[in-house]
Amino acid sequence: VLSPADKTNVKAAWEKVGGHGAAYGAEALERMFLSFPTTKTYFPHFDLSHGSAQVQGHGKKVADALANAAGHLDDLPSALSALSDLHAHKLRVDPVNFKLLSHCLLVTLAAHHPAEFTPAVHASLDKFLATVSTVLTSKYR
């Protein structure tokens, strides 16, 4: 459960992401593909090379979904319901991959905003991404 301080930290961090969301999302995906090569199996039709339009496009989708979630912290299940259905029933993504991408997102955000990435902000973002991951996997059961 996100505390009021966590919610404040998440909203502030996402405001700092601003117009860089698509680039950060793509960078996090690239980090994930390089660090955890098995995740590539979910994207057999993608050009996974650095800077590819497909990775950039999916990075934007990831960033947009997280921005939407950050704007609906009090009702994440409703905000992410369609995305949860998609990943559980159509794409059938192994839930562990959400944790891997979350880790790569944290690394990306820390790399771009080191001064703002305090231990408290890190903890809040980690809780936020873990909560998003839980919601996305809730329809697997």
UniProtKB/Swiss-Prot annotation:
Modified residues (Phosphothreonine): T8, T108, T134, T137
Keywords: Acetylation, Heme, Iron, Metal-binding, Oxygen transport, Phosphoprotein, Transport
Tissue: Red blood cells.
Domain annotation Globin: ranges: 1-141
Gene Ontology terms, MF aspect: haptoglobin binding; heme binding; iron ion binding; organic acid binding; oxygen binding; oxygen carrier activity; peroxidase activity
Residue positions binding heme b: H87
Amino acids binding O2: H58
Modified residues (Phosphotyrosine): Y24
A GO biological process held by the record: hydrogen peroxide catabolic process
UniProt modified residues of type Phosphoserine: S3, S35, S49, S102, S124, S138
Residue positions where N6-acetyllysine is found in the record: K16
Pfam families: Globin (PF00042)
Disulfide bond positions: none
N6-succinyllysine sites (modified residues): K7, K11, K16, K40
One GO cellular component term: hemoglobin complex
Recorded family membership: Belongs to the globin family.
Function: Involved in oxygen transport from the lung to the various peripheral tissues.
Assembly and interaction partners: Heterotetramer of two alpha chains and two beta chains.
Record protein name field: Hemoglobin subunit alpha
Higher taxonomy: Eukaryota, Metazoa, Chordata, Craniata, Vertebrata
